[in-house]
C-alpha cells in the first residue's frame, strides 16, 4: 500500500523535552491525593473534569519551564522531511499550549494536531488523527520512539517506524 500520510509523536521523536518526571509525578500525587498514579495516562483519564484540569495545569507549567531547553531529535526531523510531500498529523501527550509554543518556534507544521486534551490514549489519538485525515490505517505510517507508540499503531492497523534514541 502507498503511504498517504504520516503521524508523528512529539517528545522523543521530533524533540526531546527534558522534563523532571519524578518531580512532576510528586506534584500529581499531591494534587490527586493518591500515591499509586501509574500508568499516569489511565489515572488522569479516570479523574473528574475539575481535578483533571488541575493536573493538566501542573503538567503544562512543568512543560513551559523546560521549553528553552528542548532539543531536536535528528532522526525524527529527517523523517519529517522525508514525508514532506504528504499530509502529517501530530499525536502527543503534551498539552495544547505547549505544542503551540513548540511548533511556533520550529519549522514544523501539521494538518492535524491531537493533544492530551483530546485523549490520553495513544491508540485513540491515532484513530482521531485518521478520522480527521480521512484515511484508512493501512495507508498511514506512525512514527514514534516507544514500544507503546508501536503497540498503539499496530492496534489501529497503521505501519510503524521507530525513532532510535
Where are these regions (language model features)?
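Substrate-recognition "cap/lid" segment bordering the active-site pocket of phosphatases
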Residues: 96-141, 147-151
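Short, structured coil segments at secondary-structure junctions
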Residues: 84, 106-109, 155-158
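Short, basic/glycine-rich phosphate-binding loops at helix/coil junctions
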Residues: 51-63, 107-112
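Active-site neighborhood of HAD-like aspartate-dependent phosphohydrolases
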Residues: 1-42
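Short, acidic loop-to-helix structural element flanking the phosphoryl-transfer center
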Residues: 65-100, 104, 123-124
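Acidic, divalent-metal-coordinating active-site segment for phosphoryl/phosphodiester hydrolysis
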Residues: 145-161
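Structural beta-sheet core signal
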Residues: 89-92, 142, 162
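Glycine-rich phosphate-binding loop signature in dinucleotide/nucleotide-binding domains
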Residues: 1, 84-86, 133-139
Amino acid at each position: 500500500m502507498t503511504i498517504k500520510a504520516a503521524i508523528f509523536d512529539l517528545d522523543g521523536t521530533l524533540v526531546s523535552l527534558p522534563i523532571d518526571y519524578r518531580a512532576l509525578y510528586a506534584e500529581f500525587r499531591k494534587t490527586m491525593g493518591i500515591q499509586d498514579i501509574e500508568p499516569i495516562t489511565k489515572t488522569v483519564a479516570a479523574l473528574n473534569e475539575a481535578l483533571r484540569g488541575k493536573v493538566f495545569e501542573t503538567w503544562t507549567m512543568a512543560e513551559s519551564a523546560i521549553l528553552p531547553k528542548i532539543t531536536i531529535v535528528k532522526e525524527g526531523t529527517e523523517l519529517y522531511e522525508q514525508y514532506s510531500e504528504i499530509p502529517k498529523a501530530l499525536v502527543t501527550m503534551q498539552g495544547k499550549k505547549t505544542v503551540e509554543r513548540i511548533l511556533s518556534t520550529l519549522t514544523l507544521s501539521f494538518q492535524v494536531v491531537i493533544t492530551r486534551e483530546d485523549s490520553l490514549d495513544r491508540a485513540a489519538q491515532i484513530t482521531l488523527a485518521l478520522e480527521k485525515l480521512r484515511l484508512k490505517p493501512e495507508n498511514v505510517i506512525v512514527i514514534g520512539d516507544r514500544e507503546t507508540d508501536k503497540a498503539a499503531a499496530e492496534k489501529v492497523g497503521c505501519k510503524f517506524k521507530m525513532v532510535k534514541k
